Amino acid sequence: MRLIDQNSALQRYLFRGNTPVESKKFAWDKLRSVLAQTAKQEYNITLPSQYYVVDVSLLNFTEEDLTIEEKFFKENPQLGHLVHWTIVGMLINGTDLPDWLRKEAALYEKKWDFEDRLLERVPQLHDWLWEANSTQSFESHGYVKGTPLVFYIHCEAGMDRTGEVSGSYYLKYLKWTYMKTLAYDYHVENNPRPIEYLSQNALNWFCWHLYYTEGYPLDCAQSLPRK
């Protein structure tokens, strides 16, 4: 588990990790324990004793853990709310294309971002964290306005789809380089490995989109081993 970003003034925290489901049950107590431990030991942050969890699940509809998450929050709306975003990645890496074709595709997001919707979802994560009134929609799901919020992004292993979405956040809002982002994604767990190529490809497209639209220098053409 890792902290991505935080807003101490609003008491909102954005974490990434693996599935919170163990032995076909939502491991609520363990999730809270690991969140508190990670925040304190790794970032010297003391989480509030009470908070509302927004579980941003990147699992596919066919994955059993998603059904377990849905059931848990349906039965416990006072604890949190499930947000489900399907993430599939991209077959083609933008760096492998000629510059003219890559630029044309990167600027027309429907050619690369039609499924994962990173250009919409990554700013949504940032707004939830930093815009005070951005969380009003949660109030119809059991959220009490003013309660501290923990946003928890995850897939199954917490590396591939999670690395794609989290990595896009690092690039856009933390201004990390592409190489720093990849290296971090590769080493987020105890056994380092490249993130799955479909997710890495989508992250690369997001990098190129920022390069062509926002003007700040990015090293999108560089890469670590993809496999």
Each language-model region and where it sits:
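Cys-dependent protein tyrosine phosphatase-like superfamily
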Residues: M1-Y152, E156-A157, E164-K227
